[in-house]
Amino acid sequence: MEFYDGDLKDIWDSDLDPESLKISPDHDMHDWLFDRDVKDPTVILNDKLISDALLNGTQPIKTEHSYSLSSDVDSLPDSPKSLQAKIEDMDDECFPAISPKTATNGRVTIDPKYLTFHVPPTHATPISRLSSNPALNTSVADLTRSSGLQSLQAHQPHHGSGSSHVVVANLEHFQLPQHLYDNDCSSSVSSLRDGSMSPDICSDIEIDESAIKDEPMSPDSSCPASPTSQASSSQHQLSLNLAHLQSEMLFEPKHCGLLLTASSNSNNSLIKSQQRQQQILGQDNLLMAKMEIKSEKQSTSNSSDKSHAHGYGIPLTPPSSLPSDDSEGNLSPEHLFAPLSPNATVSISVANPAGGESSVRVSRTAASITRSSSGSASASGSSTSSTVTTTRQPIHTPLISSQPKGSTGTLLLTEEEKRTLLAEGYPIPQKLPLTKAEEKSLKKIRRKIKNKISAQESRRKKKEYMDQLERRVEILVTENHDYKKRLEGLEETNANLLSQLHKLQALVSKHNVKKS
């Protein structure tokens, strides 16, 4: 402790030369190094990343750190070649499908004297925020040094999601290439220099492609963004004031707007861009084509009448698709008023934006089910049809008893109900009111009786339907046999007439030969 408590007064008061305490950076450095370091003064140590070390060396080495005693590699400025390589890497990562080199369609040449960028008013941060993007900062600094840029103002709108960085440049008289890239790669404008221009004329800028791609980015701040800022960040609005153009562009003379689209865009993107442009111009009308949806179905009675009017045609509708007047089946009465009922009509119409009218009309007619029954009177195919319009009615049968709600006294059940209760293993209730279990069991066996009646009715109708089909088949077979006989007779008659015709022609030809 005495060594640390003591001061260095004795050393400083000694007669040592002050120059000898200073270390020379040039010729005295070799005294501090080992012999192996004298041979190679720049020692480079390579080590893996910590993440690679944690993966037990299974993954390839992504980056190697370089430590040098003579220079700091990370602080060196990027050369123009390395900057160009970084820019190409940015293009490959941000636009893997379309590269600026291959996307040559839709190229437009614009004089920068008449090019002005107007950006919507947003919360701009100072130019010091530009340092947060190293690649953008380096490229802008390189452009400033190489081209002598007179004025470059960088504004970065700060949104809650932090998903966009916009660079606004006032382009004046300079002729060197400029590459401006957004931080989120949402838009890319690459400009090239035309070397054949004279020094006093501004260089032309060729816009290879301008693509906008909205992607969700990780938020920079914990505070949520306001709706207005999100709306402004989702759209990159560029207003181009163009006085002279050297190629054809697509204009919309009605609204005096400019629409720039690539040739590979679909019709949906074109309509969306037009709608967005109209919203920017303050128009709320949407471009929608006139659309009408109409669904109509005719009743089964018309088709059955048409089939009966002719001797043969489509057979009758199966009874399984027609409800019964004395059975419920599987279709509840509420289904009759469904939107796709036989007599339902649905009409939806959307008018033009100019008219400003839109109407939706849904109309339904009262649901009615028709039943058609026909019987054959003779073998010639004459038939009569009768159409009866009925509605669904619940099953009322003497096999099922009914008690008014809240009644008391002795419970009277039918023989069918008692037999079904015993068959199912339920006790027969005797008094009212019923318990929960008795009500449940009674409902179950009554439903079973109704299902049995409905099944019997459907089997009866199916049998009648099959009998009608069999009779119609017999009639059609008989008619077909008669027609075949008539056809054979007509063929024989035709053959006889042809033979007579040939004979007459031969006689006429002989008579003409004799006259000649």
Curated annotation (Swiss-Prot):
Transmembrane domains' residue ranges: none
Expression tissues: In all cell types examined, including developing salivary gland in embryos and in adults, brain and optic lobe cell bodies, salivary gland, midgut epithelial cells of the cardia, female ovarian columnar follicle cells and male seminal vesicle, ejaculatory duct, and ejaculatory bulb.
Coiled coil: none
Main localisation: nucleus
One GO cellular component term: nucleolus
Gene Ontology terms, MF aspect: cAMP response element binding; chromatin binding; cis-regulatory region sequence-specific DNA binding; DNA binding; DNA-binding transcription factor activity; DNA-binding transcription factor activity, RNA polymerase II-specific; sequence-specific DNA binding
Pfam families, per database record: bZIP_1
UniProt region (Disordered), positions on chain: 213-237, 294-338, 353-408
Protein's cellular compartments: Nucleus
UniProt keywords, alphabetically: Activator, DNA-binding, Nucleus, Phosphoprotein, Transcription, Transcription regulation
Annotated function: Transcriptional activator. Binds to fat body-specific enhancers of alcohol dehydrogenase (ADH) and yolk protein genes. BBF-2 may play a role in fat body gene expression. It binds the consensus sequence 5'-T[AC]NACGTAN[TG]C-3'.
Descriptive protein name: Cyclic AMP response element-binding protein A
Classification of source organism: Eukaryota, Metazoa, Ecdysozoa, Arthropoda, Hexapoda
